[in-house]
Amino acid sequence: MTTKTAPTQKSAGMMEGQPHLKQRSREIQTFQQIRSLPLGLSEQAVGQSVTMLNQILADSITLYDLYKKQHWQIAGPTFYQLHLLLDTHAEEVEGSIDLIAERIQMRGGVTCGMPFDVAEKTKIERPPMGVESVSAMLARTVNAHATVIRTIREGIELTEHNKDYGTNDLLMSGLLRMHEMQVWMISQHLVDTPLIDEGNGRKGE
């Protein structure tokens, strides 16, 4: 004759449905590891794409933060125009960040997403905590774009060679054209042209 084991009673005062808030886990995929997906690409090609994309991701996050810093700190006669322009550019860069991160995950990689990891990885020069002149702010922004563009162009050549056409399309259509447009828009504010042409004024006035 078999006997049934009585169900274990819960400890007095224990509530069901309580979230387990102190859970921790070992890494199930390290930053260096890449999941194998049926993409029709070699392991080397995927690894090179992920490494390149993570560099662009870190630099893009840094560029976004730089834009927001300058959006808040900008001052002077062109404050309103630049305040809006810098925020518009920041939103565009923010949109590109999600595209880059998702592309890394699509390739089986791990995104570089935490601020301290981004700070270690970015190639963009760190700005001062304080406020720079408007021209210095804008020149710094153009140089930050140049850093990102350099890696994007290298990535375009790399992905073309490796036949990673999906990533190649993102780099060219989704990123390069946006950065080139933003460089043009910002750099035009660095042209040394006075707001008023004093040479056209009438003498004696």
Q: Where in this protein do the model-derived segments appear?
A:
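Conserved alpha-helical segments that form or flank metal/cofactor-binding pockets of metalloenzymes
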Residues: 68, 74-117
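Acidic, low-complexity proline/glycine-rich segments
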Residues: 6-39
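Short, contiguous alpha-helical
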Residues: 95, 169-201
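Disorder-to-helix initiation segments
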Residues: 34-56, 134
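A structural signal for well-ordered alpha-helices, especially hydrophobic packing surfaces
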Residues: 57, 64, 71, 90, ...
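Helix-loop segments that flank and shape redox-cofactor active sites
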Residues: 40-48, 63-88, 151-167
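Acidic/histidine-rich alpha-helical segments that form the ligand environment
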Residues: 102, 116-174
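Alpha-helical coiled-coil oligomerization motifs
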Residues: 105, 112, 157-160, 191, ...
